[in-house]
């Protein structure tokens, strides 16, 4: 590769180091004090004024000569000359070399409105040519305050300078701010009575405009303040140090979600121990003494803090599991709500409860001792069927005739001839009612939950769908829509309405006749596939979400 020029390499290094300092945030570590900043601006101003030093010297020498010759009798001029600081008389400022040479170009400054070189050059060019601006040479002469000024002169001469004087005053104001503006020193007199000898000393080279300010810049804050008005906002180095680079976003408040992570089983294993759970900000709980637990449970002492939920701030335990149930626990949206009944004393949080014996599939030989019932009717009877009186668990099984309007023969055995003997069926097809929130129904809204909370009453096959869904074969979305069986029967000729196994509602419905076992079977063989509780729950869930034929 070609070697990079050393100057370019230097520039690259500068850029890279600057970028690194910015990335590491080092440029924010420096505070620039106000006086340092003022000094920097002052030095920059001197730098831009440096070209004027030679011109200023000549003008001052000429002024001094003229003043000494013509105005020896004037005390004002002498006192003014004495008041002028020595650094101005000697020409140039004492600290004008403090800035390094190559920092800024000599012709201009970065500060807007302080680009004094350019302004003065334009003033020089315009005012040294009286024809261009209409200024007379009398107006260009440096001002000397004498007590002997006469007010004679023609009006034509004085009217033109007035406009230019206003212009001069405006430019001076904009250059130096209010502090710098001294009208007696800036504005030339309206009279043209200055002695003519003075005009001889003024040449184009030695001209110094009247706007030059004769007070030392060391005490000057006006020009700096003025430049600050026009400067952009200060760099981040001028701002106070912040430890964090960006302000952190507002924190969200803690919201408690009851979660198994917070639940730990205790050492004994039969008590539910909740060590710590997050509580959302709420009103502080009342002190222990005011709680009415002593009146409600006089014999039971207050539970120790181990069994209580403690918030992060270690405030007073707001939920006590042992003997009280605050209202917030009963409310299902409160942060401390526990989604299982507290009345169960020896509650263990198991995702999958263990199988008891009666929930398992039996062999045929012990069905007389414990009989799992495949029909809900036998389970929900007040007195279970005694197997001593009958040889078969469902003695009248296929001997009865269904009324023609009822398809749901699954719910019916020989023991029932009408729906009135059944408990209210809370099945899927009761669409007009929504289940009450705290009712004693199971989650899927089937039958009332039994005391042992088993799924035995779900052991029947689901009822036949009477309303066609979009997942059935009838819908045009079904893949089997065009491949239906065209059934031929004496009652219903070929019809395009019913799909596979979906025949009109009468007794010869293929599914109904298949589900009922003929009387010749003496062994207990359930006709529908028999599941244990877990398979059954799974199957029910699956059949609720998919159509019967979507295997």
Swiss-Prot record:
Q: Which pairs of positions does the record mark as disulfide bonds?
A: none
Q: What is this protein called?
A: Uncharacterized protein C7D4.14c
**Residue spans of biased composition, Low complexity class:** 182-193, 290-299
**Which GO CC terms are listed, alphabetically?**
chromatin; MTREC complex; nuclear body; nuclear exosome focus
Highest taxon of source: Eukaryota
Q: Where does the record place the region Disordered?
A: 66-111, 130-165, 180-229, 277-303
| Keyword Phosphoprotein in annotation | yes
Bias class Polar residues marks the residues at: 92-111, 143-156, 204-226
User: What keywords are annotated for this sequence in UniProt?
Assistant: Phosphoprotein
Q: Which GO terms describe its biological process?
A: nuclear mRNA surveillance of meiosis-specific transcripts; siRNA-independent facultative heterochromatin formation
In-chain residues carrying the UniProt-annotated modification Phosphoserine: 74
């Amino acid at each position: 590769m070609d070697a990079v020029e050393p100057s370019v390499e230097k520039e690259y290094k500068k850029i890279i180091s600057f970028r690194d300092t910015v990335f590491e945030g080092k440029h924010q570590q420096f505070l620039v004090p106000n006086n340092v900043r003022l000094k920097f601006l002052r030095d920059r101003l001197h730098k831009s004024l440096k070209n004027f030093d030679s011109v200023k010297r000549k003008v001052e020498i000429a002024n001094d000569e003229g003043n000494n010759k013509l105005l020896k009798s004037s005390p004002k001029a002498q006192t003014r000359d004495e008041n002028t600081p020595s650094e101005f008389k000697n020409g140039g400022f004492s600290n004008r070399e403090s800035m390094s040479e190559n920092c800024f170009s000599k012709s201009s400054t970065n500060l807007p409105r302080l680009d004094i070189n350019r302004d003065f050059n334009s003033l020089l060019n315009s005012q040294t040519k009286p024809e261009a601006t209409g200024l007379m040479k009398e107006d260009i002469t440096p001002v000397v305050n004498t007590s002997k000024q006469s007010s004679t002169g023609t009006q034509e001469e004085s009217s033109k300078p007035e406009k230019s004087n206003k212009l001069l005053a405006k430019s001076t104001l904009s250059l130096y701010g209010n502090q710098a503006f001294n009208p007696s020193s800036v504005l030339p007199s309206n009279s043209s009575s200055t002695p003519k000898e003075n005009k001889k000393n003024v040449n184009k080279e030695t001209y110094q405009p009247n706007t030059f300010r004769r007070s030392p810049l060391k005490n000057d804050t006006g020009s700096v303040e003025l430049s600050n008005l026009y400067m952009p906002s200060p760099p981040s180095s001028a701002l106070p140090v912040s430890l964090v680079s960006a302000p952190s976003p507002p924190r969200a408040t803690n919201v408690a979600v009851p979660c198994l992570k917070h639940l730990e089983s205790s050492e004994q294993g039969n008590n539910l121990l909740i060590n710590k759970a997050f509580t959302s900000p709420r009103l502080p709980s009342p002190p222990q003494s005011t709680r009415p637990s002593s009146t409600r449970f006089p014999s039971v002492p207050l539970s120790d803090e181990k069994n209580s939920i403690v918030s992060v701030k270690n405030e007073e335990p707001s939920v006590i599991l042992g003997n009280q149930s605050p209202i917030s626990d009963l409310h299902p949206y409160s942060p401390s709500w526990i989604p299982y009944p507290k009345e169960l004393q020896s509650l263990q949080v198991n995702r999958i409860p263990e199988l008891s014996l009666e929930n398992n599939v039996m062999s045929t030989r012990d069905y007389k001792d414990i009989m799992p019932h495949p029909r809900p009717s036998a389970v929900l009877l007040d007195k279970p069927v005694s197997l001593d009186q009958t040889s078969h668990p469902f003695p009248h099984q296929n001997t009865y005739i269904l009324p023609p309007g009822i398809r749901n023969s699954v719910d019916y055995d020989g023991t029932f001839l009408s729906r009135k003997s059944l408990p209210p069926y809370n099945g899927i097809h009761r669409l007009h009612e929504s289940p009450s929130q705290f009712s004693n129904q199971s989650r899927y809204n089937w039958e009332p939950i039994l005391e042992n909370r088993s799924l035995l009453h779900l052991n029947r096959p689901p009822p036949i769908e009477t309303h066609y869904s979009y997942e059935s074969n009838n819908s045009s979305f079904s893949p089997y829509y065009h491949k239906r069986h065209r059934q031929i029967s004496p009652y219903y000729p070929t019809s395009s309405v019913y799909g596979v196994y979906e025949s009109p509602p009468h007794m010869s419905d293929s599914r109904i006749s298949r589900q009922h076992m003929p009387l010749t079977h003496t062994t207990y063989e359930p006709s529908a596939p028999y599941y244990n509780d877990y398979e059954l729950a799974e199957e029910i869930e699956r059949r609720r979400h998919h159509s019967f034929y979507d295997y």
